């Protein structure tokens, strides 16, 4: 599927640019497309090189975690669950603890920690993959959970809203939590049905119900806190947990009497190799995305939706937030820029700005995640991964729009 989509992204961009030229007399569109090719190819390399430092740091920390026995303890504790959802992964596999650490980092909104840990998890899952150029069921499930990962602390979005002058920047916290939970549940359940995972299993049901209960209690608890304290609490929790994790790893290394520094260096060396590996995959995808954006195709889609909504007498207030939704699967920075632009255009306390913020927090850069995660282990055949990841993204977008109408207040 990804091969066909990649080809069509270029063909659609060319067709769209011709329409812009013929009907809008846009003579600049062709130079914009060519400029996007060169710019995004350079950006892809810059992103990869920029990952080297953070990849090296977290892979070094992971090496210490593996050698101190922390990973084994986590794996042993969660093996009963993973035996159900990832049948090909052996009991007590180190991949289990790495997956848990990755999901925890995503959960706390710690993107810089989540990516390197996620890449390590994909490498570990690759050791159990019998078809090395094709994604396994376990890798697809992990990728979907990453692409739809629940965001418990959307600290960057709250900070942007505060900087743009929103009266109550944390108003989007609960809507984001609900929308991103819907995205995660839809992503997991759809893949579980595809992979014929037994959803009636008591252990799995307990985890799903526990997840729903946790989200519910968190929402209630957060609503009970004053507006002024919410942003501060969100920031403290995320950063404190990260610092405590590093502290626990170092203290355990002292207790176990392992050579932590040497282990860190060994693990950190892998960061450079992984960053270089993903360059061609990133170039291919980011150039295609850049060409599509420069062609004006996204504007055509937005205007068509607005026209259809008005024709059917539907409230189309959400349409002004759709640029964020359309761009987010392709580019995190692009979607963030769209969110900020929406705040500037309509006001930080407007409905489009509110909805745009919720969409930004409840969806993921699906194409980036898929490209980087599978590219790091040289997998070109992603099977049904993209289709199901986009499906969970779509569920997150619909949920974000729905809860925005529910929670928005002037």
Label each region the model flagged.
Residues 35-38, 45, 94-96, 131-134, ...:
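Hydrophobic alpha-helical segments, principally membrane-spanning helices and signal/leader peptides
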Residues 1-53, 162-293, 311-312, 384-410:
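Signature of multi-pass transmembrane helix bundles
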Residues 113-114, 121-161, 166-196, 322-410:
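C-terminal transmembrane helix pair
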Residues 11, 58, 67, 107, ...:
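Short glycine/serine/threonine-biased micro-segments
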Residues 1, 90, 97-99, 134-139, ...:
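Generic hydrophobic alpha-helical membrane-segment signal
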Residues 28-127, 256-345:
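Membrane-embedded alpha-helical segments and adjacent helix-loop junctions characteristic
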Residues 100, 104, 139, 230-233, ...:
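Generic signal for short, ordered secondary-structure residues
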């Amino acid at each position: 599927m990804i091969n066909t989509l990649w080809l069509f992204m270029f063909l659609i961009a060319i067709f769209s640019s011709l329409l812009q030229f013929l009907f809008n007399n846009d003579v600049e569109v062709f130079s914009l497309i060519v400029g996007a090719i060169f710019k995004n190819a350079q950006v892809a390399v810059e992103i990869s090189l920029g990952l080297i430092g953070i990849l090296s740091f977290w892979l070094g920390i992971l090496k210490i975690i593996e050698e101190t026995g922390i990973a084994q303890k986590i794996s042993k504790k969660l093996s009963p669950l993973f035996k159900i959802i990832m049948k090909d992964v052996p009991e007590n596999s180190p991949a289990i603890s790495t997956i848990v650490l990755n999901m925890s980092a995503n959960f706390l909104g710690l993107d810089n920690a989540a990516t390197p840990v996620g890449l390590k998890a994909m490498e570990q899952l690759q050791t159990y993959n019998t078809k090395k150029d094709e994604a396994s069921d376990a890798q697809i499930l992990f990728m979907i959970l990453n692409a739809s990962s629940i965001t418990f602390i959307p600290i960057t979005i709250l900070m942007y809203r505060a900087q743009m002058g929103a009266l109550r920047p944390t108003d989007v916290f609960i809507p984001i939590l609900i929308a991103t939970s819907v995205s995660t549940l839809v992503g997991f359940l759809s893949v579980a049905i595809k992979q014929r995972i037994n959803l009636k299993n008591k252990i799995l049901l307990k985890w799903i119900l526990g997840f729903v209960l946790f989200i519910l209690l968190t929402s209630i608890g957060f609503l009970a806190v004053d507006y002024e304290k919410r942003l501060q609490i969100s920031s403290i929790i995320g950063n404190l947990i990260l610092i405590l994790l590093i502290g626990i790893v170092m203290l355990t290394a002292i207790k176990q009497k392992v050579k932590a520094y040497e282990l860190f260096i060994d693990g950190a060396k892998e960061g450079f190799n992984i960053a270089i590996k993903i360059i061609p995959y990133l170039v291919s995808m980011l150039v295609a995305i850049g060409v599509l954006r420069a062609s004006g195709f996204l504007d055509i889609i937005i205007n068509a939706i607005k026209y259809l909504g008005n024709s059917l007498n539907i409230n189309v207030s959400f349409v002004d937030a759709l640029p964020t939704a359309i761009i987010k699967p392709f580019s995190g920075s692009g979607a963030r820029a769209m969110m900020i632009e929406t705040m500037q255009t309509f006001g930080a306390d407007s409905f489009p700005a509110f909805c745009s913020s919720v969409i930004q927090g409840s969806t993921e850069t699906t194409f980036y995640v898929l490209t980087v995660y599978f590219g790091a282990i040289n997998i070109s055949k992603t099977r049904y991964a993209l289709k199901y990841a986009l499906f969970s993204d779509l569920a997150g977008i619909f949920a974000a729009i729905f809860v925005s109408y529910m929670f928005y207040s002037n």
